[in-house]
Amino acid sequence: MVKSHIGSWILVLFVAMWSDVGLCKKRPKPGGGWNTGGSRYPGQGSPGGNRYPPQGGGSWGQPHGGGWGQPHGGSWGQPHGGGWGQPHGGGWGQPHGGGGWGQGGTHGQWNKPSKPKTNMKHVAGAAAAGAVVGGLGGYMLGSAMNRPLIHFGNDYEDRYYRENMHRYPNQVYYRPVDQYSNQNNFVRDCVNITVKEHTVTTTTKGENFTETDIKMMERVVEQMCITQYQTESQAYYQRGASVVLFSSPPVVLLISFLIFLIVG
């Protein structure tokens, strides 16, 4: 008997709890429905809970409430409200609002100044070094270098060089190192094309070079061509080593396994 009573009370308690949960789910939220005491929109002033923007407390179409098209409210098209297109509100396109489109607010406006565009001349100038020079048969122009300090064996030439070194080139023309069998061929070709181009360009501007200038220019350009060859050779061998490393079977298998783990 005791067990049967206990079971009955447990059943009754379970049914009561289930019914209470069902009622809680069906119970309407306060002030959330249409035409109820609450409002569906935040920031409305009336307790009537209409469906339109912030109003002053009257019903629809009244002169002093907050209804549609009224002179004293917060609705659409009013002169003293917060509706759309008004002169003294916070709506769209107003001169005295806060946050609307094109207003005097500080955030979210569409009339911000556009960002300055990148000057393409600066981009082209930055990409000039190391690029293939048109009209020179595949020669490239190296980066600017400091002109080396060279001693020519006598005071006159040393002084002449120091006084005129600014007239000599600080960049050299060259072809890729893989087109030459050794450093001497690279340097000889580099010196010839660089001195020729610099002489022609400078002569066109009305400045002539003497035999002493040509002699010193060849010595200066030779040193710069040697430096250019060493730089290009090191970069070439590094690229070749990278290709060999990533083409080896163990590395290929490792990369394939990592890709399989990421994709899978």
From Swiss-Prot:
Q: Where are the sequence repeats?
A: 54-62, 63-70, 71-78, 79-86, 87-94, 95-103
Q: Where is the composition biased (Gly residues)?
A: 55-107
Signal sequence coordinates: 1-24
Q: Name one GO cellular component term.
A: Golgi apparatus
> Propeptide positions in this record?
242-264
Q: Where is the lipid attached (GPI-anchor amidated alanine)?
A: 241
**Its membrane topology, per UniProt?**
Lipid-anchor; GPI-anchor
Lipid biosynthesis listed as a keyword: no
**Function description:** Its primary physiological function is unclear. Has cytoprotective activity against internal or environmental stresses. May play a role in neuronal development and synaptic plasticity. May be required for neuronal myelin sheath maintenance. May play a role in iron uptake and iron homeostasis. Soluble oligomers are toxic to cultured neuroblastoma cells and induce apoptosis (in vitro). Association with GPC1 (via its heparan sulfate chains) targets PRNP to lipid rafts. Also provides Cu(2+) or Zn(2+) for the ascorbate-mediated GPC1 deaminase degradation of its heparan sulfate side chains.
Q: Name one GO molecular function term.
A: copper ion binding
Q: Which gene encodes it?
A: PRNP
Residues holding Cu(2+) 3: 88-90
Q: Subcellular localization, per the record?
A: Cell membrane; Golgi apparatus
Official protein name in the record: Major prion protein
Residues engaged in binding Cu(2+) 2: 80-82
Indicate which residues the UniProt annotation says bind Cu(2+) 4: 96, 98-99
Keywords of this protein's UniProt record, alphabetized?
Amyloid, Cell membrane, Copper, Disulfide bond, Glycoprotein, Golgi apparatus, GPI-anchor, Lipoprotein, Membrane, Metal-binding, Prion, Repeat, Signal, Zinc
Instruction: Specify where the region named Disordered lies, as residue ranges.
Output: 28-118
InterPro entries tied to this protein: Prion, Prion/Doppel_b-ribbon_dom_sf, Prion/Doppel_prot_b-ribbon_dom, Prion_copper_b_octapeptide, Prion_N
UniProt similarity note: Belongs to the prion family.
Q: Where is this region: 6 X 8 AA tandem repeats of P-H-G-G-G-W-G-Q?
A: 54-103
Which pairs of positions does the record mark as disulfide bonds? 190-225
